[in-house]
Amino acid sequence: MSDSQDQDRKAPLKLTQPGKLELKKTVETGQVRQSFSHGRSKVVTVEVRKKRTFTSAGGAMHEIKDGVHSVAEADLAAAVAKVEAASRAASAHDLTTGEKAARAKALQDALRHEEEVRARAEEEAIRHAAEEEAARAAEEEAARLAEEEAARRAAEPQSEPEAAAPAAEPVAPTAPVAAAPAPAPATPVAPAQPKPVAAAAPAGDATAVPRARTEEEEEEEERAKKRAAAHKPAPVKRTEPRRRTGKLTITDALTDDDRSERGRSLAAVKRARERERLKHMQKGSEKVIREVIVPESITVQELANRMAVRGADVIKCLMRLGVMATINQNIDADTAELVVTEFGHNMKRVSEADVLVGLEGEADTDEVLFTRPPVVTVMGHVDHGKTSLLDALRATDVVSGEAGGITQHIGAYQVTMSSGDKITFIDTPGHEAFTAMRARGAKVTDIVVLVVAADDGIMPQTVEAIRHAKAAGVPIIVAINKIDKPGATPEKVRQELLQHELVTEELGGDVLAIEVSAKKRLNLEKLEEAILLQAEILDLKANPTRAAQGVVVEAKMEKGRGSVATVLVQKGTLKVGEVFVAGAEWGRVRALVDDHGNSIKEAGPSTPVEVLGLQGTPAAGDDFVTVEDEARAREIAGYRSRMDREAKAKLAQRGTLEQMFSAIKSGEAQELPVVIKGDVQGSIEAISSTLEKMGNENVKVRILHAAVGAINESDITLAKASNGLLIGFNVRANPQARDMARRDGVDIRYYSIIYDVTDDLKKMLSGMLAPELREKFLGYASIREVFNITKVGKVAGCMITEGTVKRGAKVRLLRDNVVIHTGDLGQLKRFKDDVKDVREGYECGMSFTNYEDIRVGDVIECFEIEEIAVTL
């Protein structure tokens, strides 16, 4: 026992009571209910921070408090002391740590509850006191005003207005509502003086006051009310900012009164929004002028959306314009322009062809142009040594060296002369690319070298080549080949050229004729000099610094390389990696290969190259243009593909030759191009001479080519390029030509009698002439009465005086023998029934289309317009 007491004495001193070391909360929290207008309130959490100090008393640490501020705090202190005493007593009984923590928590909950109850009680007391004070102040103010008014009324009947004014003046000073005790001593002072006066008034004259309540007294009473309203206490100036933000403190919560700013109610917010909406509606919305983009065809709904109007309004506008359309119906750009103008917007017309705008670039100035090599096409009969001449010219290329047997990789190549000048040659067997390029109006070839054998002279295919060159509008240089043969007669060739309007320099013309021998390599230098001289006369120049443009000479699909196009660059410089468009195809340049099979990085003007990287295979003769990015290339290629599909669809729908020449009827063309193929030369000459005599100053037949033999692919290509007619006299087309004609839409006519040819051609030429319009008189009608019909307009009641009046005919309105209107007859009725015509002596009702200025006594002249076909 003594040992245990010794151990208790030796126990070290602790800063807290025995048990687990804990920290009590130094921040007490509570909740305060904050009130708003319309009976709304919300609970706000507040915090109170305390500074706690402890001292040692009786071997344990106790908290030192500043003092008990209220009875509740004293009770709490006593309760805390009891709990601490109980805890010390319980420590002797070995309480567990969990029990100690539970008791401590229960104590804290009790303290917090007491604090909340006290805070709510104080808040309620303060609020009730403020309400009672405000009510008492309002009652005192009302009583004071009533006494002053009574005193003023009593003083008015007396002849002392001077005394009444000082009595009312003490009311003028305003006092704050918060100063409630101030009016108490002032209340008996104000009416102290008027009381004897009010009592003396009935003593002197009892009926004076009732008689005094006249109109003047009522007016004075109104003025007193206005003065009282003017002297109302001024509102308390708000010292706090509106829409207070931040944390609510205990002081603000306990001292809350009516002066504090309250939040806006939901009803006030709704009223403000309604006022703004009404103000916006009353002000009226200003019309917004928009820029409406209108394509070639647009639906009514889409047009309404772009103008930001209702579709029904657009339909009404179309009805006023005489167009009946539904919401989903397409209208043309002209009608859409009228609608947009009617609504007051600005219109911008666009077309699908706008994607091609700016594709060719701007025109080059003379400062940026440099001389470029000429592009030469070698043409002629296959047996006249054209291939041998090409091989001989290629062998003179100083770049290729002495080997000479260089394989030609592409259909075009470039030769460098000994002088350093370059010439680009294009090999066009069959002339497919040449005619296709002419059809697109592309002037690819600068000079044509016409090869004619000195021993054979002019052959049918030579004549065909001459016509191709003339159609392209390029100068011709005649190369008279095979002069080394014994039977060569160059002079005969020059004489035969005169029949085809080619006059050589030896005969006084301007056509250069060079006598050469491809086999013996004679006068090749003279031919090259003649080409360079002609190029110098043409002054061929190009800008090498701009975006590349050119033409596709030929295109093919190769295994392992994909689509490969042979391109002749005309302007600019083509580089690897550039994006380009070739006809309806596009791609990116993956590689450039020259005519010697070498890969190059770029190609300048008049340079033929192979281009790899196409997405598809273009057609020979398509234009080749580089663009800025792939998006533009896809857009252009897509547009051209659609145009090609539409053109093919139109060709498939075309059934007669008259439909093919519908454009000619509208005045777009005045010539009928024809290609003639026959069995014998005599028949061809007869047909040609007959067709050339046809026509007049307005229309005529243009013979593109006339030869003996079957119809082949070259004839189809020539007819397609010129959009002409192909005539076969006692001959037929081979299978390849038929397939090509079916694909390209070329019309082939077969004949066996020459008179049938002349009759059909005469009808075609007559169809090209515009028909003659002739007026046919129908009758007269006199207007006897004018009726105004609802939803119809003015209707003329007429009597037919001469001839017949037909529905749908043309009419003239005559007034005093002067024509004042010419238009169409809209309606023709007899006894409310629509009739086709009305004869002389009958009455009828007539209305005019889009015209209502009709009067009694006017005369209506009815007539028809007849189209008379013009014949040759």
Swiss-Prot record:
Stretches for region G3: 427-430
Annotated Basic and acidic residues bias: 130-155, 271-282
Family annotation (NCBIfam families): IF-2, small_GTP
Segments of skewed composition (Low complexity): 156-181, 195-211
UniProtKB keywords: Cytoplasm, GTP-binding, Initiation factor, Nucleotide-binding, Protein biosynthesis
Protein name as it appears in the record: Translation initiation factor IF-2
Transmembrane feature ranges: none
Family: Belongs to the TRAFAC class translation factor GTPase superfamily. Classic translation factor GTPase family. IF-2 subfamily.
Function: One of the essential components for the initiation of protein synthesis. Protects formylmethionyl-tRNA from spontaneous hydrolysis and promotes its binding to the 30S ribosomal subunits. Also involved in the hydrolysis of GTP during the formation of the 70S ribosomal complex.
Gene3D superfamilies with a match to the protein in the record: P-loop containing nucleotide triphosphate hydrolases, Translation factors, Translation initiation factor IF- 2, domain 3
Binding residues annotated for GTP, in chain numbering: 380-387, 427-431, 481-484
Assigned GO CC terms: cytosol
Region (G4): 481-484
Composition bias, Pro residues: 182-194
Matching PROSITE patterns: G_TR_2, IF2
Subcellular location: Cytoplasm
One Pfam family it belongs to: IF-2
Positions of the UniProt region annotated as G5: 517-519
Location of region: Disordered: 130-282
Residue ranges of coiled coil: none
An MF annotation (GO) of this entry: GTPase activity
Domain tr-type G, residue spans: 371-539
Chain intervals for the UniProt region annotation (G1): 380-387
Region of interest: G2: 405-409
Annotated source species: Paramagnetospirillum magneticum (strain ATCC 700264 / AMB-1) (Magnetospirillum magneticum)
